[in-house]
Amino acid sequence: MTAGAQTDGAAERSALRRALNELDARLADATERGPGAHLRFDPLVDRLRTPVAAFLQPELERRLDLHVDADDSFARDRIAHVLAGACGVAALSALLRAMEHDRNDGGDTLQLDLLALFRAWPEESIRLVLAGVGSDDPRTRQIGIWGLAVIDFGGAKYFELVADMASDPDPQVRAKVMSTLGSIFGVGDPPRARAILIAGARDPAPEVRRNAVAALGSSHDETVTDLLVACADDTDRWVRYWAAWSLSRRPGPAVRAALERFAADEDGDVRDAARAVMG
């Protein structure tokens, strides 16, 4: 490498570091947030989304962790977008780790970056996702399930692995299984998915019952209908809420009686759901 090329490379790295410092300052400025913030930040973020900026990976990962800990989804997603563009497949682990701590369900942009990485590097993606499924950390297992449902759309290859996790000791993991089996992933084995969801609707943990009951809304057979009617006696208001919605477009006096009970429920959200279903 010539002295001129070395000088040019050093100058480019210096410029990228200044751009990252500017991004830090703007992310810390509350006046930069608000309507149109994404568009205002895009030029600076795009400037950093270059493989030349890969040398900044350790600093970007530290910033990502800080924004995740601060529950700042806007800053987190800007840094994650930079990290994915600059580092490619090497950013996968950090972005998956950030997904584990998405406490505000604001991870849509982060998910889009992960989906792009999954498409570009499928072999490394499935390796990391499978490792997540086998992790001792329940949060990591949840993200592993999410990743499998994305990569194996329709459950053709990994349905059994996810289905077996319906017996996971952690209720949040079991709840994730219920919502996953209620999605298109469940077509990998519809009878088993249905059986697991029915069992999930009787799980001791309310978060599992909620997701199972919500997922059973598309099953209109008598067994499922009777189960949803029985949810009028569930002690968890969100189970009752989802049961009311899942009883939509089902005939019969027992369904009508259950909806009338939901419409008189002590919880306002349950009452509103039942009244909407009843018309």
Regions found by a protein language model. Name each.
Residues 10-28, 51-67, 88-100, 121-134, ...:
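Amphipathic alpha-helical scaffolding segments comprising HEAT/armadillo-like alpha-solenoid repeats
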Residues 256-279:
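Leucine-rich solenoid repeat scaffolds
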